């Protein structure tokens, strides 16, 4: 195993959080989801913005730009308008270099500051926006997605702690989620069609893994808040697209 592979493997499982922490997060979000989609959306916006602000290492003044962009983009999910949300995301991305240049010292590279700000708000914003749109369209699919990610991350946590067959950790962690997905579809516990299991399972597995790898490679020192949400980073938008196209 090369040094790069070891480094990537270590970052892939970086900051998983404790099982109790995962259980509390998933439990609160699921409870809010069943109460009302608006309540869930508001709680999600508050949660991701608080997570980013509390776990960031920068001074308070430096946290304001990414938190502001995060709240702005995440809140558009409450409007249930995908096109408007896409325009807001585009505007936020365009404004990021401007924010990165404000207050930058000569020793700080502009490209590094842009990456730092983007990594601080974009992953969490995509997660909150996707889940907000999803909860407004199909509550059962949103609840199932939260459960799938919970089972995956718990499986990842257990597999890492076992210290056996480390190269198979991503596969072992995925088994529980795919088993839950298959059972839910077969028992009609979700609106997803039975014949959609294979493409959904492939999309879910690839997007979870790709999201964690992307966060691991994005920056040399990703914030803990981003690592905590890395399983959601690409899987939430992909899952939302599956639901929008497969659920009548």
Feature locations, PLM:
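Membrane-embedded alpha-helical segments of transport systems
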Residues: 65-67, 175-176, 230-241
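Interfacial loop-to-transmembrane junctions
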Residues: 215-239
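Juxtamembrane boundary at the C-terminal end of a transmembrane helix
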Residues: 240-248
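Membrane-embedded alpha-helical bundles of polytopic integral membrane proteins
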Residues: 2-211, 215-223
């Amino acid at each position: 195993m090369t040094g790069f592979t070891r480094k990537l493997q270590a970052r892939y499982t970086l900051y998983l959080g404790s099982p109790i922490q995962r259980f509390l997060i998933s439990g609160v979000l699921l409870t809010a989801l069943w109460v009302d989609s608006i309540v869930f959306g508001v709680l999600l916006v508050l949660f991701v913005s608080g997570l980013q602000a509390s776990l960031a290492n920068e001074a308070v003044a430096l946290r304001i730009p990414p938190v502001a962009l995060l709240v702005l983009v995440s809140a558009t999910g409450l409007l249930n308008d995908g096109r408007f949300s896409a325009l807001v995301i585009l505007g936020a991305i365009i404004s990021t270099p401007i924010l990165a240049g404000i207050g930058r010292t000569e020793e700080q590279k502009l490209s590094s500051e842009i990456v730092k700000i983007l990594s601080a708000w974009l992953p969490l914003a995509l997660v909150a926006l996707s889940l907000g749109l999803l909860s407004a369209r199909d509550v059962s699919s949103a609840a199932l997605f939260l459960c799938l990610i919970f089972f995956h991350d718990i499986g990842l946590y257990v597999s890492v702690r076992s210290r056996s067959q480390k190269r198979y950790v991503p596969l072992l962690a995925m088994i529980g989620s795919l088993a839950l997905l298959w059972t839910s579809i077969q028992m009609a516990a979700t609106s997803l069609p039975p014949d959609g299991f294979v493409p959904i399972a492939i999309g879910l597995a690839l997007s979870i893994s790709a999201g964690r790898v992307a966060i691991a490679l994005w920056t040399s020192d990703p914030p803990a808040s981003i690592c905590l949400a890395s399983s959601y980073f690409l899987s939430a938008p992909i899952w939302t697209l599956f639901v929008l196209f497969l659920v009548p």
